[in-house]
From Swiss-Prot:
Forms a complex with DabB. GO terms for molecular function: zinc ion binding. Its main location: membrane. Its cofactor is Zn(2+). It is a peripheral membrane protein. Coiled coil: none annotated. InterPro entries: DabA. Part of an energy-coupled inorganic carbon pump. The gene is dabA1. Keywords: Cell inner membrane, Cell membrane, Membrane, Metal-binding, Transport, Zinc. The keyword Metal-binding applies. This is Probable inorganic carbon transporter subunit DabA 1.
Length: 895
């Protein structure tokens, strides 16, 4: 008996598919005119290659655990508008970009936003029109939800049953009793886990050296697992598949009788049915181009599509399950009205209303004045009373939102301290290679490739110092090798049982210590957190930089770029501190996600150490002087490390500090300790703790699923001078990047900030947004059921899709969400003309702003302007920004 699933008209393709179906980017040929020729035909081959590349472009990569960073899951959609992307994704997936009405109702009830913000949101899209009826409809929808449901419920909306274009496994699962979707996920997950294993498994896959598809094909031909579950004849089916990925994909699509106009959409449905493994195989392709030539081979991603398609075809043929694809094409040109169209429209408005409410609150905290060299303030500006005229210390932090609280309290405790904000890799993109290893980790944003390798070395000093440090280096190598040997003994097939019988008792002592004496273990960790992160165990090998072609001139270029990016080219304080940051947790597989994103998910301490060493080099200072940057002889630069879990500062390489600065260091340490205590006190309510010691204990609590909130709550980025925000609480929600337009007449520094740090901040913002709004697709579920797989990722339970996003514990506690899903609001203190030049030059920045992925406000000559999607600027009144939108004074606009 044949099961025919004729798609109803409301499952047709939306008009948003039209651009993708009409034209290919390479040769402007519509996919629907594919001739039924052999795959070997060069013309067909080129079109298939282009088709697969376009599918791959929509998927965002997933980084391994050791380098895990926040990634924008929607990065491949930036050429579309934010709301169009929502409609586009829902054609082939259950993806959701908008929070639920329950979410908006709860925040409206709590006063997070008001009617004026709803009105402003409506006027943004329809200026000058009478929108009173639409506003009344939105308010009615909010009130209805308040009275009919629990407005404190989840942030994400309810899922629909199936997307319009779904996999065969999804459709059969919806019509039958067997969940073939989960079975296929488990089968693919089982194979991918073994194929990419990095040493966790005792027995490695015999086909791990083959490409993913070929390895799967060899295994699937002899694996009876899925046949036992009901898919009979699968081994024979796989044996008859073509040997190459591209040929297999074409063969399987034709076997399903899918019209060529739907190939791309159907492949996207398969990619988004496994977002984790799709992202992981996309990452594998990125690693095929380490030199940045742009010629990457995404063979494994294509292999994953072929594998998923194979299961679909086998299921379709085994159960005689067919889809009437012609009904989809029949309604392809129709304008589809979603069943949730009105609700969706309301949620679009309410999302923007909440963003405007936050923007108003942020801008209200900033002084309204023209930032000039003579600091002429208007009546609304109050100069902080504790601001010193000449700083004794200048301390640079990462732009990470967790630095905002600490910087504020540091300046509050001591007015002679000035803080600056810069990307935490300090402009030094390198691979950090620990002593005794041949390779290391990249300490740079993932958008950049490392320019050189920074190696640790044995100490060149003599006497007891050399003996001590050489011993330390040897111990590091021995400890690493010992851990590997110990792990092999624990997991070996022969020794694992005897290991438990003989050594297990001793492990009980460590278990008892963890449970009964947490304060003792905590004191050991907190006193020297840098040693846990290997940030100053051994000196750095600068001679190796020269061997790689990074001579003094290039080293000078690097630190000159660093100083210019910070806006620190004169008026140096006697003591300059470069403070990297990292997190300190125990038993946390996703620990890298709490470290410095600008350092690729690693500690920023090595970057700070290298930058300090280079800036103290008199030869480099001489070259900087020749370039117009004079570092006084009495200025000394040191490195530090901000522990974001405990909010403590670890001071690095203090043995290199001259005697003239020792007393200053001691004073600064006392100031930092006081600031640490104040910062922890401010964070207490957020983590529901009663004393600051509890926050410190979280760093060593192996049962703690939420050691810190990370970057939860991030909502904006401010690019401007510190005087604009000094003494003002921004609630730890703002990326703060130092910038002074008066020292950047050509706009080069502004361009570098908008094209790099702002993009990284946007990625982080979108990762938190997506994991909050759509945790099923872009989150990673509950930490308590995570299992590390292959040392590179985590599974939720014992199989299925790779978990790609943030866990629930990083976003909220129970029904209370710590992260509020808002798109990034960037505030730039610069002229609109200079910003426009950057936007006009860089299409990716233009896409982010004009397509609604990022919002921007410029503070120009004391006035505030909002960037509009058409490239113009809308002036905002300072006392009531929302109401000012109704005036719509359009200014400028060159794009």
């Amino acid at each position: 008996m044949t099961n025919k699933a004729n798609l109803p008209s409301n499952e047709s393709i939306m008009n948003t598919l039209a651009p993708e179906q009409k034209k290919s980017k390479a040769n402007a040929q519509p996919f629907s005119v594919f001739v039924p020729a052999a795959y070997e035909d060069p013309h067909v081959y080129r079109q298939v290659e282009e088709l697969l590349d376009q599918v791959c472009q929509v998927v965002s990569p997933v980084w391994p655990l050791k380098d895990w960073i926040a990634v924008n899951p929607y990065a491949g959609l930036s050429e579309r508008s934010f709301h169009e992307s929502r409609d586009y994704l829902r054609v082939f997936s259950k993806c959701e970009l908008l929070p639920s009405m329950d979410h908006f109702s709860a925040h409206y009830q709590s006063g997070s936003f008001a009617e004026s913000h709803i009105e402003a949101a409506l006027l943004e899209n329809s200026p000058g029109k009478d929108l009173s009826q639409k506003k009344a409809d939105v308010l009615k929808a909010l009130q209805t939800r308040l009275h009919t449901g629990d407005a404190s419920k989840q942030t994400m909306p309810e899922k629909s049953s199936l997307p319009r274009i779904a996999t065969i496994a999804d459709r059969l699962s919806a019509h039958g009793e067997v969940d073939w979707t989960e079975i296929v996920k488990d089968e693919i997950g089982k194979h991918c886990s073994a194929h990419y294993d990095e040493g966790q498994s005792t027995w490695a896959s015999p086909w791990r050296n083959l490409p993913l598809y070929q390895a799967w094909r060899n295994k699937a031909k002899i694996d009876r697992g899925i046949e036992i579950l009901g898919l009979t004849g699968f081994r024979h089916f796989v044996d008859e598949l073509p040997h190459t990925v591209e040929a297999t994909i074409v063969h399987l699509l034709q076997r399903l009788n899918i019209p060529r106009a739907l190939w791309e959409t159907f492949l996207l449905a398969h990619a988004f049915s496994l977002p984790g493994w799709s992202g992981w195989t996309k990452y594998q392709g990125l690693q095929t181009d380490p030199t940045g030539t742009g010629r990457m081979q995404f063979d494994d991603f294509r292999g994953l599509l072929a594998m998923s398609l194979a299961y679909d075809v086998a299921i379709s043929e085994a159960f005689l399950f067919e889809v009437n694809w012609s009904s989809v094409l029949d309604h392809q040109s129709l304008s589809l009205m979603d069943s949730d169209n009105d609700c969706k429209s309301d949620r679009k408005i309410l999302l923007r209303a909440m963003e405007i409410a936050y923007r108003d609150d942020l801008l209200a905290k900033l002084p309204v004045r023209e930032l000039t060299t003579d600091h002429v303030a208007d009546e609304d500006f109050e100069e902080p009373t504790n601001l010193a005229t000449k700083p004794a210390v200048q301390m640079a932090f990462c732009i990470d939102v967790r630095s905002e609280r600490f910087r504020r309290h540091l300046e509050q405790v001591d007015a002679s301290v000035d803080t600056l904000g810069i990307a935490g890799f300090f402009g030094l993109p390198f691979e950090y290679v620990p002593l005794g290893q041949s390779s290391g980790d990249t300490h740079a944003p993932v958008l950049l490739s490392p320019k050189f390798a920074l190696r640790e070395k044995s100490s060149p000093c003599v006497g007891d110092c050399a003996t001590s440090r050489n011993d330390t280096a040897e111990k590091q190598v021995s400890v690493r090798n010992g851990k590997k040997l110990w792990k092999r003994l624990q997991t070996s097939a022969v020794g694992c049982f005897s290991f438990v019988e003989t050594i297990g008792l001793f492990s009980g002592f460590d278990l008892a210590t963890r449970l009964m004496s947490p304060k003792f273990r905590n004191s050991l960790r907190i006193k020297h957190p840098s040693k846990l992160h290997d940030v100053e165990a051994t000196p750095l090998d600068l001679d190796h930089l020269v061997e790689q072609g990074i001579d003094l001139d290039q080293q000078t270029d690097l630190v000159e770029g660093l100083l210019n990016s910070m806006g620190l080219s004169d008026d140096f304080a006697p003591l300059v501190v470069l403070c990297g940051h990292g997190s300190q947790t125990d038993n946390n597989a996703m620990a890298a996600g709490l470290d410095c994103g600008a350092c690729g998910g690693h500690s920023g301490a090595p970057n700070a150490r290298l930058a300090a060493i280079l800036l103290n080099d008199r030869r480099i200072q001489k070259r900087l002087s020749d370039r117009g940057i004079e570092i006084p002889a009495e200025t000394h630069v040191i490195a530090a490390w901000h522990n974001t879990t405990t909010d403590q500062i670890e001071w690095l390489d203090l043995d290199a500090v001259p005697a003239s600065h020792q007393s200053r260091i001691v004073e600064l340490q006392n100031v930092a300790d006081a600031a640490s205590h104040l910062t922890r006190e401010e964070r207490l309510p957020l983590l529901n703790e009663s004393c600051t010691d509890s926050l410190i204990s979280r760093a060593s609590d192996w049962s703690q699923t939420r050691p810190e909130w990370g970057l939860a709550g991030n909502a904006s980025m401010l690019i401007g001078p510190r005087e604009l925000t000094r003494g003002r609480s921004l609630d730890g929600r703002v990326f703060l990047h130092s910038y002074n337009q008066t020292t950047d007449p050509k706009g080069a520094v502004l361009e570098s900030i908008l094209t790099a740090p702002m993009v990284v901040a946007h990625w982080i913002n979108m990762q938190y947004y997506a994991s909050t709004v759509d945790p099923t697709l872009f989150g990673s579920g509950c930490k308590t059921i995570h299992n590390v797989v292959g040392q590179f990722g985590v599974l939720s339970g014992n199989g299925g899709d790779l978990q790609a996003g943030l866990p629930n514990q990083s976003l909220g506690c129970g029904l209370k969400m710590q992260h509020l899903p808002l798109r990034l609001q960037t505030v730039v203190v610069a002229s609109r003309e200079s910003i426009d030049r950057v936007i006009a030059k860089h299409a990716n920045i233009r896409n982010l702003l004009q397509n609604g992925w990022v919002h921007m406000v410029a503070i120009d000559s004391g006035q505030k302007y909002r960037y509009h999607s058409d490239g113009s600027w809308v002036q905002l009144r300072t006392e009531n920004t929302s109401r000012a939108e109704s005036e719509w004074q359009v200014v400028g606009g060159t794009c």
